Amino acid sequence: MWFMYKLMIIIPADIEDPMLNARWPDFLRAAESMPGLLREANARVVTSLFGDQQINMVHELFFETLIVLQEAMQSPDGLIAGQIIQELTQGQMTLLVAEHREDDIDNLRNYQQND
């Protein structure tokens, strides 16, 4: 299992794709230049199965530590990325910082065999 921190950007469904598509490359250019970025993930929501919040997309930026994540957000590229995502969503996105733990199925099965 491994552990890191991620910045989660949740974009609501009422933000139109044409608006996102117009400046999304600019956002990615800035976000992907943030110091300490280890990896990135993007998920377009296909179907909402339950809940009140309708979501268009979840974009995640992964960092080794919380301090590195915070420093990246305050970096020049982080500030530019933040400004662009604010403009793209008219401030309607949700930003979360989360601890991310991940494991692969083979390791999980090892625990099941020991039960």
Q: Where are the regions a protein language model picked out?
A:
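C-terminal structural segments of small proteins and small subunits
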Residues: 72, 77-97
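Short S/T/G/P-rich N-terminal loop/turn motif that feeds into the first structured element of a domain
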Residues: 1-57, 62-74, 98-115
